[in-house]
Each structure stands twice: as C-alpha cells, then as structure tokens.
C-alpha cells in the first residue's frame, strides 16, 4: 500500500511537467496482485530433491573392480594387434635420419656395387621382389595397414620402421609416392625364382643392350623384353645400371620376370648365348642411302646407329667403307660388312639375339663383329626420309615383337 501511495504522489508531482508515468503505476499494481509463494527451509528442499531422485530409475554403477577390468580388456585388445600381424616394428622419432641416409646412399651406383643393396619403392615392385625370393633388409612405411599387403614370413627377418609420410615424400623420386620404400639385397639372376607364367611363354629370343645410357629407355626396353617372352637380357659395359631407381620404375617389375645380366665384356657375351644363335642388329641403314658420303657426326642415326671415331664413311649396300686418309695407319678401323634387310622379312626361324644400340653412341664395332661371326644381319625399320632415328626403346619393341611373331609361327608349323 505504501508503494501505491508513493507512486500516486510521484505521479501528481510529475503530471504538471507533462511526463508519462502510467508504466510505473502499472508495474506497482502488478506487484500487488502476485500470489504469495511458500518459502521452504533448506532441509525441506533437500528432502524433496532426494524424493525426486528416488523416483528415477536406478542405473547400476560400476565398481572399482569392474572399471579396472574393462580398462584391462581395452589394453589387451590393443596389444593383440601386434601378435596378429606376427611381426614387430619400430616407430621413427622426430629427427631420425635413417631414411634419408639409406635412400641417399642407395641411389649411388658405387654403394650398390660395394654393399650389394638396391632401393625399391612402391607396392608393385616390393611385391614382385618378395615373390621372386629377393631378401628384404629394411622396410620404411607410413601406415601400419601397408604391412598386411605382404606375406608375414617375408617380413619377419626385416627391419620394419614406421616413418612420417612427409619424410617419404621428401626423399621419393615419385610425384605421388605410395608410402613404401624397401632396401633389398641385390638380387642374383641365378637365384631369382621367376613366375611360372613367364617361363612358360619364354622364347629362344635374347636381347643385347649396347650403350643404352638413358634410364627411362632401358627400363622400357626391359619391360618390352619381358612382354615379348625373351629368355634373357644382356647389358654390356657402358649401359646404365639396371638397378638404378629410374630404370626400376620404368621396368615395372621386369627385373624379376627374366634374367638381366649386367656389365658384360663383349668377349664373354657369346658365353651367355645358346649354340647356333644368330645375332641381328637394329640398324637405321636404308638401301636408298647407296653411295651417299658425308662427314660422320656425333649422331648415331647419321650412320646407322653405329658409333665410330669421326672420319668420312662411304655408305653402300655392302657395308660401311672407310675413306679416311689414315687408311695406311696401323689403327685403321675395320667395319664388317653385313647384309641389310627389312625387319618384317623372315629372319627369326632359329634361336636369335637382337642388339639395340643407344641413341647417342649407337652400336659398337664389337656388336658388328659378333653379328658377322654368327652370320647375322642388319635389320632396318623403314621410316620417312629426313626423319631422325627412332627411339631405342621403340625400335627394340618393334623388333622384339616381330621376332616373337616369326618364332611362334615357325613353332606352329613344326608342330
């Protein structure tokens, strides 16, 4: 009531001033109309709260023993994952330089020859290597799930190291690395277990690489040789190392599908060829070049993929004849004359070997001498005039699959 009186007096005082006070009066009136609320003591309030909680459904609480038991089960399940994989691995800590050190050294040919180790990257190469019997020494991986991709018995004796994917990406030569890098003992072609499907389709066809120095070309040539069913690939001294990482990537596992024998002298090349094998040369010589003379340039294609010392050469159908003023010298170059024929003519009716020369240095004189000794020929692939020689990998693929076709047709006629 006192509040109402104060509001009325205030309204009377402010009314002459022209101010509105209806809102204040109504507020006080509403305050008088409220129903009183019973005030509960603290004890009664606590008793009502307990009654409400008593009416709620009770949920069983885990005892301390049950809590410890459940934690033990979770820990046991985490520990059983390692025995399920049947091998242990270690996690590389930040600052671990084992990956960078091993990868850097393994990319060196001197290290590969001295320590007998090679670097393989990617699931495909690792799988082919393990299936062929290659010995895995160290495996770097970025995810534990990757270990399930390989047979457990092949990983038991290896050193397994889990590293960050960013580290693999830094040291990988691949644009999109898969997170797998392995260090293997350098495989021996005599101890490798080649796939049964590969050996079943092997033909009496060999490939000799002479001065192939481009890693991509050599890898592609090895892949073509495996696809054509060659029984072996011989690499003479001067070729790029077959276990170079770029060669391995371009080969797509061909190293583990057929014997690849490296660093051979021409004197021992015939020891790796079966008796009666004819040697044919992939040559850029064309019959329409008869009696054309010119200075020998550094391009092998200018004189039929045959690399010689710079001097003038007379190119004829019978062969390459030197017209140098130094003919009377003791070191006069002898280039054997070999018959030339088109690659699609009949030439692969018996065991044969094809020699592919590099694009820069071409065929060596030793290859011509070997072909002459085995009654071989020069095989040329017709191309449009004034076009440079074909890529060595392309020429190899054309001749290999043509040889495969002719050998298979001969075998069908005999059967």
Curated annotation (Swiss-Prot):
InterPro entries: Alpha/beta_knot_MTases, MRM3-like_sub_bind, Ribosomal_eL30-like_sf, rRNA_Methyltransferase, SpoU_MeTrfase, SpoU_subst-bd, tRNA_m1G_MTases_N. It is found in: Mitochondrion. It comes from the Eukaryota. This is rRNA methyltransferase 3, mitochondrial. The keyword Transferase applies. Residues 1-47 form a transit peptide. Keywords: Methyltransferase, Mitochondrion, rRNA processing, S-adenosyl-L-methionine, Transferase, Transit peptide. The gene is mrm3. S-adenosyl-L-methionine binds at residues 357, 381, 390. It comes from Xenopus tropicalis. GO terms for cellular component: mitochondrion.
């Amino acid at each position: 009531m006192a509040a109402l009186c104060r509001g009325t007096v205030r309204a009377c005082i402010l009314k002459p001033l022209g101010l509105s006070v209806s809102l204040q009066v109504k507020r006080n009136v509403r305050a008088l109309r409220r129903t009183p609320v019973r005030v509960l003591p603290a004890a009664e309030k606590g008793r009502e709260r307990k009654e409400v909680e008593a009416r709620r459904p009770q949920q069983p609480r885990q005892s301390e023993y049950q809590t410890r038991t459940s934690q033990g089960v979770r820990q046991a399940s985490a520990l059983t994952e390692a025995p399920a994989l049947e091998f242990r691995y270690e996690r590389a800590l930040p600052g671990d330089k084992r990956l960078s050190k091993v990868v850097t050294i393994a990319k060196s040919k001197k290290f590969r020859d001295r320590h007998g180790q090679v670097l393989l990257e990617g699931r495909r190469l690792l799988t082919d290597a393990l299936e062929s019997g290659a010995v895995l020494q160290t495996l770097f991986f970025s995810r534990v799930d990757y270990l399930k991709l390989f047979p457990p018995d092949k990983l038991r004796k290896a050193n397994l190291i889990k590293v960050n994917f960013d580290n693999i990406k830094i040291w990988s030569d691949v644009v999109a690395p898969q997170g797998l890098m392995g260090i293997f003992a350098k495989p021996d072609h005599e101890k490798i277990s080649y796939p049964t499907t590969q050996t079943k389709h092997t033909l009496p066809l060999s490939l000799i690489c002479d001065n192939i120095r481009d890693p991509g070309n050599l890898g592609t040539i090895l892949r073509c040789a495996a696809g054509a069913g060659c029984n072996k690939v011989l690499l003479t001294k001067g070729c790029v190392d077959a276990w170079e990482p770029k060669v391995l990537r371009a080969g797509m596992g061909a190293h583990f599908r057929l014997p690849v024998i490296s660093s051979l002298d021409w004197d021992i090349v015939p020891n790796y060829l079966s008796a009666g094998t004819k040697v044919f040369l992939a040559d850029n010589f064309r019959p329409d070049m008869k009696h054309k003379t010119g200075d020998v340039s550094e391009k092998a294609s200018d004189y039929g993929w045959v690399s010689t010392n710079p001097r003038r050469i007379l190119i004829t159908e019978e062969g390459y004849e030197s017209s140098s003023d130094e003919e009377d010298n003791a070191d006069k170059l002898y280039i054997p004359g070999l018959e030339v024929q088109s690659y699609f003519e009949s030439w692969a009716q018996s065991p044969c070997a094809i020699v592919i020369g590099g694009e820069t240095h071409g065929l060596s004189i030793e290859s011509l001498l070997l072909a002459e000794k085995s009654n071989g020929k020069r095989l040329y692939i017709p191309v449009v005039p004034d076009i440079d020689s074909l890529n060595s990998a392309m020429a190899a693929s054309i001749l290999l699959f043509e040889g495969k076709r002719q050998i298979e047709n001969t075998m069908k006629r005999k059967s």
